[in-house]
């Protein structure tokens, strides 16, 4: 096991987000939530990998998924079932929702999107910002960008961030208000998890560099459309209002992944 492997650097990064968020803002809301998501994610990964593939998978992926779910899922007080169900759905999706041997959704993205869509009255998404704590932002973004570079997905992160900033300016020009209010969300832990762990997930991104950049640009555009839908009260988009980036990726990502795998299969034949 090489600790310089991007997989373990990503484990360290998400642990850093967890520790910083919990120490500064108590964003977990209870360690029972963390124990539930981590325990079920790891147990499900171990059981399904052994049962379906004949070997126990590396649990680093389950750990990352568990931390993401524990941080991002914010249900009504004192209920644990969204964490338990979300953890099981996230890991199970890797073994069920597959095409040509690859899963189509990032596990935590799929689970959170599903929970928000079907149980929006009970489940919300983390909305904390890091406020004016520049040190936390600098540390997490600096390490996150370094990990993205080491994992060779820096172009994905930077493309999404650039598109987010550009489209935030466009939305601001349309609806008005302070531009900083449009840009502020990307400094928070939800977007840090999104740009460093979801849109860059190697197992659910397309095969070419240009394709990956195009996909995240479309995700950012879809997110902006959802946000504008909220501004103008478009009823058709109402189910997507709780978390535009999560739901935009849940729609665009698997379609792009399926098409990429389909094209590769046709070329092979």
Would you name each region that the model predicts?
Residues 1-13, 168-269:
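C-terminal transmembrane helix-loop-helix hairpin of multi-pass membrane proteins
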Residues 1-50:
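N-terminal signal-anchor module of multipass membrane proteins
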Residues 13-15, 33-45, 61-70, 82-90, ...:
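Alpha-helical transmembrane segments in multi-pass membrane proteins
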Residues 25-40, 72-86, 122-138, 179-192:
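Structural signature of hydrophobic alpha-helical transmembrane segments
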Residues 43-54, 89-103, 142-152, 196-206, ...:
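C-terminal ends of transmembrane helices
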Residues 55-62, 80, 100-110, 154, ...:
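Short, non-helical or kinked segments that cap or interrupt transmembrane helices
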Residues 55-131:
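Membrane-interface helix-loop-helix junctions at boundaries between adjacent transmembrane segments
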Residues 119-170, 176-177:
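Internal active-site segments that recognize and position negatively charged phosphoryl groups
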